[in-house]
A protein has these predicted regions:
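Structural motif corresponding to the C-terminal cap of alpha-helices
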Residues: 66, 70-74, 98, 102-106, ...
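N-terminal entrance/gating region of PLP-dependent enzymes' catalytic architecture
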Residues: 1-78
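Alpha-helix boundary/capping residues
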Residues: 11, 97-98, 139, 163
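Conserved active-site and cofactor/substrate-binding residues in soluble primary-metabolism enzymes
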Residues: 33, 53, 57, 89, ...
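Conserved beta-loop-alpha segment that forms the PLP phosphate-binding cup at the N-terminus of a helix
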Residues: 56-59, 63-64, 78-111, 127-131
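A generic secondary-structure signal marking the coil-to-beta-strand transition
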Residues: 34, 79-80, 135, 163
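PLP-dependent aminotransferase-class I/II
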Residues: 85-88, 108-181
């Protein structure tokens, strides 16, 4: 194990200095307590909520915190949501939920569902391209500009039509660090 560790570390060291990486979705600093928690939990499969039921309780609390932060319209005390391991998975889950809701509504109205689209800024998380390819959804991007460093709402609305599933806001635009007005 030590030889394998040294080979991998030597091979990747120059590429894996997070404090020097400003281009991807990585954490550049982590408190020692976060590191300790991760090390202590590395052998647990948190997806198995029957084995680790407290994880479901913590996830529910996090979902409620975010739902309240974003002023969701739900009145019940326990908000609806799903646990995602990373931002790509969270985008996929949210995208599928929005697409299925749009599709169900269109079918109930007797309208076609063959040309769905999503509208978002060009500062989107890259998984949205893959999502749109997988589900055959047209991706409509609103360019970021010097005067609009987050989603330009007026331009986004111009790109919407009856086939628009939703406008996807970005919380933490990679290029600017700013949040779309959610």
């Amino acid at each position: 194990p030590e030889i394998a560790y040294n080979i991998v570390k030597d091979e990747t060291y120059a590429q894996t200095q997070p404090r020097l990486n400003l281009a991807t979705f990585v954490t550049t600093y982590m408190d020692e307590y976060a590191t300790r928690l991760m090390n202590e939990a590395i052998s647990m499969n948190y997806i198995d909520q029957t084995e680790y039921p407290r994880v479901a309780v913590m996830a529910s609390r996090c979902i409620n915190i975010l739902a309240n932060l974003w002023h969701t319209p739900e009145k019940n005390e326990s908000k609806c949501g799903a646990l995602g391991i990373g931002s790509s998975e969270a985008c996929m889950l949210g995208g599928v939920a929005a697409w299925l809701r749009w599709r169900k509504r269109r079918i109930a109205e007797g309208k076609p569902v063959d040309k769905p689209n999503l509208v978002m800024s060009s500062g989107m998380q890259v998984v949205w391209e893959k999502f749109c390819q997988l589900w055959q959804i047209e991706l409509r991007q609103v360019p970021l500009t010097r005067t609009h460093r987050t989603l330009n709402i007026e331009e986004a609305l111009k790109q919407c039509d009856e086939n628009t599933i939703c406008i996807v806001p970005i919380a933490g635009v990679t290029w600017t660090g700013l949040n779309d007005n959610i």
